[in-house]
């Protein structure tokens, strides 16, 4: 059955090869002949635990990929982060060619699965599905990128291409401050013309031209305190917990229907005495049912598609916070996380080019996917500087949880898509 499915995958591209250039056909033929080697590279990387905080594991995956890229003529560097960030660093592979646009290819070495978390080795579940830690997010995508580059080398095209392949070591849990963790990443991206990221694909027919940004907010409420028998009176007021509840519910009423905007209070503490450990996201509260609460503390996130949407939402939230209940006072402060990857004209033009590519390959149309289906990613840090696309990696289900899977039927086609697309962009 597996052989039959691979044959069908070959036919999907073979039937329209007349519309492809000779180097594109050579790259596709290489992938058909070497899909087993690509799968073995995937298995080897999945079977190395590389949770973000497992520094040795992240570096081991980096060494595995570096060996493959070095064979292709890439210059290999390891970019160390400051010791204070407690992260492994990043793998950077550079190939200098003679012509064409300079491509910035993005992967990441780490996964969410730390050594003490439930996750498993690469395991084939059936003829179309395999599972394993990070198998699609994003070791599957890393191998898509590397195998596509191998195919272009075999087709005699890589020698002319200008490529930086950048694999971050802390995408899932960036070192802090984030500006330090991504300084080198941003600087190198700004020397390039186009960025392509190999995060999980959502099937064969969509790609990410936009990703929502992420930011945080902190709400602090203080209030008069006293015996609960006097709550709601002019002298005592409503208390901090009621004020926090009013604010959160008004956020929900006024902002929850706006497309691509989400906000989530993930942590709340209130009572007579409140202690917060922001570093470990923990809190303690003490209170009694007959005491009006004088303090409440809430933290949450805010996700948005554009900077304008973010700022408009923040202004509404400030206005809501300012309308305090009697006897209370509230303040809200905001923190920036990852910016949005906005659906710019340059990104949409890349979608059109990819759509032409997949049509020529016989895969069918490719459209821009729903930005609301994705959170922020490494590409968000550089999206303001150059045209970019994401979601060019492996497809599957269940990312970030035990049982994460990869779709083995779509995998060869996604590698071919990447190879032909990179070839066309580099012309």
For each feature predicted by the language model, list its residue ranges.
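Alpha-helical metal-binding/catalytic segments enriched in His/Glu/Asp
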Residues: 105, 126-176, 217-221, 232-254, ...
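Acidic/histidine-rich catalytic neighborhood of metal-dependent amide-processing enzymes
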Residues: 138-214, 270-280, 426-427
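Acidic/His- and Gly-rich active-site-bordering loop/insert found
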Residues: 19-133, 153-158
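Metal-dependent amide/peptide-bond hydrolase catalytic core
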Residues: 19-26, 51, 68, 84, ...
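Bacterial Sec-dependent N-terminal signal peptides
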Residues: 1-23
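Extracytoplasmic/secreted envelope proteins and their assembly/folding machinery
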Residues: 39-43, 62, 66, 142, ...
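Short, flexible, mixed-charge acidic loops at enzyme active sites
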Residues: 114-124, 210-215, 278-283
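Short glycine/proline-enriched loop/turn "hinge" motifs that connect secondary-structure elements
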Residues: 34, 113-115, 157, 209-213, ...
């Amino acid at each position: 059955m597996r052989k039959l499915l691979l044959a069908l995958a070959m036919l999907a591209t073979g039937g329209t090869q007349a519309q492809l250039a000779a180097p594109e056909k050579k790259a596709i033929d290489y992938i058909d002949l070497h899909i087993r080697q690509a799968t073995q590279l995937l298995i080897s990387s999945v079977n190395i635990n590389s949770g973000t905080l497992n520094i040795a594991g992240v570096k081991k995956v980096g060494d595995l990929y570096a060996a493959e890229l070095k064979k292709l003529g890439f210059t290999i560097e390891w970019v160390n982060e400051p010791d204070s960030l407690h992260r492994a660093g990043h793998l950077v592979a550079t190939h200098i060619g003679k012509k064409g646009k300079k491509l910035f290819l993005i992967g990441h070495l780490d996964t969410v699965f730390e050594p003490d978390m439930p996750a498993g080795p690469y395991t084939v579940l059936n003829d179309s599905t395999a599972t394993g830690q990070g198998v699609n997010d994003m070791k599957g995508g890393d191998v898509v990128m590397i195998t596509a580059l191998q195919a272009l080398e075999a087709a005699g095209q890589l020698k002319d291409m200008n490529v930086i392949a950048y694999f971050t070591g802390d995408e899932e849990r960036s070192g802090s401050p984030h500006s330090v963790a991504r300084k080198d990443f941003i600087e190198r991206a700004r020397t390039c013309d186009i960025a392509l990221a190999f995060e999980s694909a959502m099937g064969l027919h969509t790609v990410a031209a936009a990703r929502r940004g992420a930011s945080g907010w902190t709400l602090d409420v203080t209030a008069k305190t006293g015996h609960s028998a006097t709550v709601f009176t002019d002298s005592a007021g409503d208390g901090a917990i009621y004020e926090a509840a009013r604010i959160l519910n008004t956020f929900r009423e006024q902002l929850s229907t706006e497309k691509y905007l989400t906000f989530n209070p993930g942590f709340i503490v209130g009572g007579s005495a409140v202690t917060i450990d922001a570093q470990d996201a923990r809190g303690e509260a003490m209170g009694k049912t007959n005491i009006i609460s004088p303090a409440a503390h809430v933290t949450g996130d805010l996700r948005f598609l554009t900077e304008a949407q973010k700022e408009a939402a923040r202004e509404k939230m400030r206005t809501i916070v300012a309308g305090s209940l009697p006897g209370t006072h509230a303040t809200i402060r905001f923190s920036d996380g990852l910016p949005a990857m906005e659906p710019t004209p340059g990104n949409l033009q890349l979608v059109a080019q990819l759509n032409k590519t997949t049509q020529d390959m016989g895969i069918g149309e490719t459209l821009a996917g729903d930005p609301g289906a994705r959170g922020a990613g490494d590409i968000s840090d550089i999206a303001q500087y150059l045209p970019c696309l994401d979601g060019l990696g492996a497809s599957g289900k269940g990312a970030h949880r035990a049982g994460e899977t990869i779709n083995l039927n779509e995998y060869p086609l996604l590698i071919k898509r990447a190879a032909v697309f990179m070839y066309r962009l580099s012309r």
